[in-house]
Amino acid sequence: MTELSYEDVTPIARLNFDPAAIPDRGDAPWETLEDFPAASRAKPGDVKMGNSGPGSIWHLAHAALEDKVGVKFNPIPFGGAAPAVLALLGGHVDAVAVSPDEVAIHGSSGKLKTLAVMADRRLKGFEKVPTLKERGIDLSIGTWRGIAAPKATPPDVIAVLTEATRKSADEAVLKDALDRLSMGHAYADAATFRDTMKRDNEVFRQLVGKLGLKA
């Protein structure tokens, strides 16, 4: 397998940002984000938090939250976000770290409630859900989708791709689709996109090291 770094590509633009969400059951004993880590501090290791598998983005989000609030949850890995959410619905774990779109339907039914999202601002469709930053926790983590080209791509080709992507990102049909899927329309130009890649690379490198994960 070829190793690939963000430095090996030329960023064109980021199209969205899909932050981590922290949902628990609708009948869970904690009502706010502050209640959740407090329960773990009271009984270390008792609070079971599901994730989508070792080294996955939602596992890293889970670990980043632990690091920021100074608690240790009992991590329960699953083979993806969907089985983690099913385990939460079944009462087998106390909370999960997943994307908002994976729990939106269960939130509207009242089966689950989302305590917070790891984003810079509140999400469309989740307007009542606070961000971690609103709660004094400086953490914004999730996944994103964007356009990049091979590093040796000629500048004139990059210019064409940049303009086409900018126009496409401004189309109502794309914005509506991302909002409908709770996937957070968040266009960013090439410079901002590269900064995001660089920041995430460093954050994830540190988390992977702390977790002792190896390829």
Can you annotate each of these PLM segments?
Residues A28, I57, T153-P154, H185:
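Glycine-/small-residue-rich active-site loops that bind phosphorylated ligands and cofactors
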Residues S56, A82, G90, A97, ...:
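Soluble non-cytosolic domains of exported or imported proteins
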Residues W144-P150, I158, T162:
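A short beta-strand structural signal in non-transmembrane regions
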Residues D67-V71, P155-A215:
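An extracytoplasmic/periplasmic, membrane-proximal ligand-sensing/linker region
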Residues M1-I147:
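Conserved hydrophobic/amphipathic secondary-structure segments
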Residues F78, P100-S109, P150-T153, E171, ...:
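A broadly tuned preference for mixed-charge, low-complexity surface segments
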